[in-house]
Amino acid sequence: MTMLAAKADPMTLSMGPHHPSMHGVLRLIVTLDGENVTDCEPILGYLHRGMEKIAENRTIVQYLPYVTRWDYLATMFTEAITVNAPEKLTNIQVPKRASYIRIIMLELSRIASHLLWLGPFMADIGAQTPFFYILREREMIYDLFEAATGMRMMHNFFRIGGVAVDLPYGWVDKCLDFCDYFSLKVDEYERLITYNSIFLKRVEGVGTISREEAINWGLSGLMLRASGVQWDLRKVDHYECYDELDWQVQSQTEGDSLARYLVRIGEMRESVKIIQQALKVIPGGPYENLEARRLNQGKDSEWNDFEYQFISKKPSPTFKLPKQEHYIRVEAPKGELGIYLIGDDSVFPWRWKIRPPGFINLQILPQLVKGMKLADIMTILGSIDIIMGEVDR
């Protein structure tokens, strides 16, 4: 019997949007030829909340609680960039103790972010067990956050000139105990995952980005370092006290999903080293909170003026942003998180431009998935690690 070969028409498939607690409200319009991906178009904007415009109608202190809603899995970094921008613009010096406290909190937040990437990423490619392991360690980090800041998430801990409160009694010892415990758990993750043959078949050679492509697309963070570019803003920009600590930039040369996994594993190890060193050499002195100092001016405080007795009668008495512009950036878990701030001799920013790492890194997704299998889309998308709160802003 003769069989006639018929070419099927391309099929268009809509992936997402999902719930924000899952893969986020990202929609992918995928065109398929059988199982092969021929085109992919990301649709954004489902989680847009106008964060930049809100910033232009708030003082920096009023805006701080909003920024933890960008990347809600690494909120310390959004707080850090929000206070760093006016600090650089107005040349405010941060006490050494406050700088060390910031480093400790940032690196704990980096570990928590990488952990909550690792669990769902493994679940996406068919391994459920690591998801429960990472929640166990992440819970310990959140306990440390709760003891120091009062909040497990959305900490609202950073302040202009320092941090909100000093570390509580006994917190340093608890954090050191966690670091000793977690170092062994990273070894456990590696034994469980890294050399697993099924895992390697799903990630090795999938979503490869060359060194030149990574630079030309403007990628940042571990997307850049996994392609052989040793670029880490903690080393490049010398912010906080990172230069006083001994640690190495983690990088790989292959540029595939496996390389991005290995960089994250390496970064968790380095973060533990940074935290341990910072806890052992953290100096004494003030932790500084400029806004709290304003409140403690006694009876003559500007806060006691009649104009402030009624809500919205007058903006809170805070410092004015000079008529200057400045770009400030930090090395967030997902890449370069930046703020372009323009002051206008007002308590409100004239322009507050957010450079989210996920938005820039997501650009390369259509190129990576073309020619791949449908099942590889979740592997590649997961290896990029995006949070739609910061992508859509």
Curated annotation (Swiss-Prot):
Pfam family name, one: Complex1_49kDa
UniProt keyword Transcription regulation present: no
Gene3D superfamilies referenced in this protein's UniProt entry, alphabetically: Cytochrome-c3 Hydrogenase, chain B
A GO term for molecular function: NAD binding
Disulfide feature: none
UniProtKB keywords: Chloroplast, Membrane, NAD, NADP, Plastid, Plastoquinone, Quinone, Thylakoid, Translocase, Transport
InterPro entries linked to this entry: NADH_Q_OxRdtase_suD, NADH_UbQ_OxRdtase_49kDa_CS, NDH1_su_D/H, NiFe-Hase_large
Compartments (UniProt record): Plastid, Chloroplast thylakoid membrane
Biological function: NDH shuttles electrons from NAD(P)H:plastoquinone, via FMN and iron-sulfur (Fe-S) centers, to quinones in the photosynthetic chain and possibly in a chloroplast respiratory chain. The immediate electron acceptor for the enzyme in this species is believed to be plastoquinone. Couples the redox reaction to proton translocation, and thus conserves the redox energy in a proton gradient.
NCBIfam families xref list: NuoD, PRK06075.1, PRK07415.1
Protein name, per record: NAD(P)H-quinone oxidoreductase subunit H, chloroplastic
